[in-house]
């Protein structure tokens, strides 16, 4: 997370997000820098509008409760299917017994 925080700090300060800048922020914070992670972060942020990403990241949190409703409907369908299967099994069992005592 420190790497992302460093990038956000640079962005909020209006500085360019480069490998050297991220390394400087992390070093100033006393974090041991992993060059591979820094390179991956800079490459991943290339062409990304950070302001837009922050705004979009906040929106799904508010929409998350609405997503729970379809899941509940799916669970209800599964329960109904299980009940129907149980009824079919019971009917088959009764038919089998009737055949025995016919």
Curated annotation (Swiss-Prot):
GO molecular function annotation: structural constituent of ribosome
GO biological process: translational elongation
Keywords, comma-separated and alphabetical: Ribonucleoprotein, Ribosomal protein
Entry-linked Pfam families: Ribosomal_60s
Keyword Ribonucleoprotein listed: yes
Subunit description: Part of the 50S ribosomal subunit. Homodimer, it forms part of the ribosomal stalk which helps the ribosome interact with GTP-bound translation factors. Forms a heptameric uL10/P0(P1)2(P1)2(P1)2 complex, where uL10/P0 forms an elongated spine to which the P1 dimers bind in a sequential fashion.
Protein name according to UniProt: Large ribosomal subunit protein P1
Gene source species: Methanocaldococcus jannaschii (strain ATCC 43067 / DSM 2661 / JAL-1 / JCM 10045 / NBRC 100440) (Methanococcus jannaschii)
Lineage, top ranks: Archaea, Methanobacteriati, Methanobacteriota, Methanomada group, Methanococci
């Amino acid at each position: 997370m420190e790497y992302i925080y460093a990038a956000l700090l640079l962005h909020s300060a209006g500085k360019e997000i480069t490998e050297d800048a991220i390394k400087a922020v992390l070093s100033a914070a006393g974090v041991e820098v992993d060059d591979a992670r820094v390179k991956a972060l800079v490459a991943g942020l290339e062409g990304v509008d950070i302001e837009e990403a922050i705004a979009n990241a906040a929106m799904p949190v508010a929409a998350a409760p609405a997503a729970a409703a379809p899941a509940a409907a799916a669970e209800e369908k599964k329960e109904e299917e299980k009940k129907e299967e149980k009824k079919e099994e019971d009917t088959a069992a009764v038919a089998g017994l009737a055949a025995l005592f016919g």
